[in-house]
Amino acid sequence: VVSVIKNLSNTSCPWDLAEFGGVARYASHWALGVIDGGGGRCFPGGHASAGFAFVGGYFALRRKQPVAARWWLAGAVLMGLVLGGSQQVRGAHFMSHTLWTGWLCWTTGWLVALAAVALRPRIAAFLHSTPAPVAD
């Protein structure tokens, strides 16, 4: 999800902005279709998503192992913030990029968990069905 949005994004990195020695002018990452004069493809944060991607494990663990799920979530959020923070120090992202990346990863994990719960009866029925004989 993050890679797709990033490839479609016109938002440039902070280091590309004129205020910080680049050539781009600031434009909100929500100003869709606005070309800021820079390279774009800077929103959301790819490095942060490497950590935040693991929030999906929380949804897998939360019902049967809630304590482990909370620890898993804390680790994933911490890694996302550390990786996103390291990019901010370099000038590659704003804090908003990191926070929105976390939200995107959380929402994706939540939607996948909802789909898994909704599809569980169908998957179980499929796995326990007897295949029809094949005619020669």
Regions found by a protein language model. Give the residues of each.
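Juxtamembrane inter-helical linkers in multi-pass membrane proteins
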Residues: 20-27
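Transmembrane alpha-helix/helix-exit interface in multi-pass inner-membrane proteins
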Residues: 1-20
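Membrane-embedded catalytic cores of phosphoryl/pyrophosphoryl-handling enzymes
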Residues: 27-136
